[in-house]
């Protein structure tokens, strides 16, 4: 199972929101997903190579894209986003969103390598639930955007340390060393960017009603599982932490 993770920070109704967005795609589906993404980029955005015309949530869902759709009847960026969500469905993907408005969690990470911040920890728990329930005996691979920042390196080291130092059977379900890839050459990371953008819009006060159909489609791709314990609570992998 391939997991692709991205981050976003947005101001919604005057409130700062931080969100992690992730996509899980079965490894045997990923080449097909990449082929679908190339077809989308070629038809809708005029790309001649897979790495051209990077798809990003902020661009696809910009107000200007909706204005163009209203004035001219279509928008290439909105079509690309629509078809991307369709490709996630057809290639058996699941999506994950952890969002927060809590001042202490807004950075989404810790400054050091010895502790994983709560948003990332909750995301990892959800990943593990998917692996335990849907892919037992297989290993998941965590993939991040290679931006070359020290903060990214620190987060990767913190996740690796957490997996190897704590109980939880992480090594049974994951390769404990995260991968970093430039997002322009990774359809999975571009999908995670779109999911992160929409995921932040789950925050109260969402002031862009035109986004609601896309948000609902994103919700439909989330994973739902029962958390072990007395309460046996049902958990859906698009939620707030505080």
Predicted stretch roles:
Residues 1-242:
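Phosphate-ester processing/binding pockets and catalytic centers
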């Amino acid at each position: 199972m391939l997991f692709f993770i991205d981050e976003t920070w947005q101001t919604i109704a005057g409130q700062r929101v931080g969100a992690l967005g992730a996509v899980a795609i079965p490894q045997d589906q990923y080449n097909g997903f990449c082929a679908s993404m190339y077809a989308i980029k070629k038809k809708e955005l005029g790309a001649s190579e897979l790495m051209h015309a990077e798809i990003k949530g902020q661009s696809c869902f910009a107000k200007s894209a909706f204005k163009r759709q209203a004035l001219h009847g279509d928008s290439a960026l909105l079509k690309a986003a629509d078809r991307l969500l369709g490709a996630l469905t057809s290639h058996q993907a699941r999506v994950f969103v952890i969002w927060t408005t809590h001042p202490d969690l807004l950075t989404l990470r810790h400054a050091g390598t010895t502790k994983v911040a709560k948003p990332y920890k909750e995301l990892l728990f959800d990943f593990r639930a998917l692996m335990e329930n849907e892919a037992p005996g297989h290993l998941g691979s965590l993939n991040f955007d290679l931006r070359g920042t020290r903060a990214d390196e620190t987060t990767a080291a913190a996740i690796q340390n957490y997996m190897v130092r704590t109980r939880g059977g992480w090594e049974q379900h994951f390769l404990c060393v995260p991968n970093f890839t430039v997002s322009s050459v990774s359809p999975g990371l571009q999908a995670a960017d779109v999911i992160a953008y929409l995921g932040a819009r789950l925050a109260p006060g969402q002031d862009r009603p035109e986004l609601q159909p896309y948000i609902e489609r994103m919700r439909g791709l989330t994973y739902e599982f029962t958390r072990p314990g007395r309460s046996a609570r049902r958990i859906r992998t698009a939620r707030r932490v505080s």
